[in-house]
Amino acid sequence: MVVAVYPGTFDPLTRGHEDLVRRASSIFDTLVVGVADSRAKKPFFSLEERLTIANEVLGHYPNVKVMSFTGLLKDFVRVNNARVIVRGLRAVSDFEYEFQMAGMNRYLLPDVETMFMTPSDQYQFISGTIVREIAQLGGDVSKFVFPSVEKWLTEKVTAMGGPAA
């Protein structure tokens, strides 16, 4: 049985993330979506909110587990007995950082492979940062996130005194 880990902040989880989950879950026996605490990134949504959102969007995949983690990815990979780390590459600009991380992970986890996946064409330009910015400025994010995520974004932006839907 091959277990893979797909780590990320998922702030928020986008259609691009779900696209990679759908495709990776068809390759591996188990795909663990690791929602990183990432306090240093100052996430828009709390860890608990991001876990709830991920479970709402991904809960229908029978071989996908959503879990949070803090600390080093290598420890999360080991705890889950994963043999593969799945990473998404949207553009060439992602490659340098992801290449460096893959090298470090190979050093820390010599028996674990990193697999890069590109999103489907219609999702290559989507990022959580851009989606948050559009939502905070009152724009339509419905093509980039699922309806439940759009609702979370609207409620959060409104609670922060931003545009109402």
UniProtKB/Swiss-Prot annotation:
Pathway annotation from the record: Cofactor biosynthesis; coenzyme A biosynthesis; CoA from (R)-pantothenate: step 4/5
One CC-aspect GO term: cytoplasm
Pfam family, one: CTP_transf_like
SUPFAM superfamilies: Nucleotidylyl transferase
Swiss-Prot/TrEMBL keywords: ATP-binding, Coenzyme A biosynthesis, Cytoplasm, Magnesium, Nucleotide-binding, Nucleotidyltransferase, Transferase
Subcellular location: Cytoplasm
The protein's enzyme class: transferase
Cofactor needs: Mg(2+)
GO molecular function: ATP binding; pantetheine-phosphate adenylyltransferase activity
Similarity annotation: Belongs to the bacterial CoaD family.
NCBIfam families: coaD_prev_kdtB (TIGR01510), cyt_tran_rel (TIGR00125)
Protein name, UniProt field: Phosphopantetheine adenylyltransferase
Organism of derivation: Burkholderia cenocepacia (strain HI2424)
